[in-house]
């Protein structure tokens, strides 16, 4: 017997699963399809939330990244409450060296 779903999410990485959890919390019936972990992008990012270190030239993109970063502590707390598992989130900053272009 097939079960009707409201939403299909393709990709079981951090973003796809986060979207699925939030939609399901709001009452949607969600299915997530993911090929496998090796091909997912989530494990390559190492959990870095550093929009200032990305040299973003688009003000809109930088604004989006900054707003997302400020929402992250609330989201990780929500995940910990839902799952009973600590996320390990630690807002510790980064060190980003700045190099000047050589003058010739």
Regions found by a protein language model. Give the residues of each.
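Flexible, glycine-rich phosphate/dinucleotide-binding loops
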Residues: 16, 39, 58
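Glycine-rich FAD pyrophosphate-binding loop
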Residues: 24-45
